Amino acid sequence: MASSLNRMGPSVNKCIIYIDHLPVKTFYLATVEGDQPHVRPFGAVCEFEGKLYIVTNNKKDVYNQMKVNGKVEMCGMNKGTWIRVKGAVKEDTRREARVAMMEANKNALQSMYTVDDNLMTVFVFESGIATIYSFTEEPKVINL
């Protein structure tokens, strides 16, 4: 994975590659509701138009939390390294964005969503920073 990260050009691709190489492709997304943080597992990301995207169901609490306060953090771990992604997300209602997510994560998403089901919703990181940490190396910072 490290060699894949070093070869990649665009920043978002480095973040996607790291998440795609997580052992079970699970990362954790943190949101806030009032003064209470909420963390839950997620499993799909994609790059669309050079930006990092995540997906959820618009009937879930996480959807409402991100609509009210778009500041989120994600984290995942792989073989002694871990990634933290923090930033601001915004819902992208365009069908093309949902199609990109479905194409990038068909195996994970096709049993839950279709792009036109009025449930599948994608959020784009409008700004953010991903940092890959290790116990043995300096952190690698990726601007989103």
Please report, for each region that a protein language model flagged, where it lies by residue.
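Extreme N-terminal tail/first-helix region
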Residues: 1-27
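Conserved beta-strand in the GNAT
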Residues: 41-43
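A short mixed-secondary-structure module that forms the rim of ligand-binding clefts
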Residues: 45-80
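Short glycine/serine/proline-enriched coil/turn segments at secondary-structure junctions
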Residues: 36-37, 80, 133
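Charged, gly/pro-rich active-site loop segments
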Residues: 4-7, 84-144
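General beta-strand recognition
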Residues: 28, 52-53, 73, 84, ...
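A short, Trp-centered hydrophobic/proline-enriched beta-strand micro-motif
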Residues: 19-34, 72-74
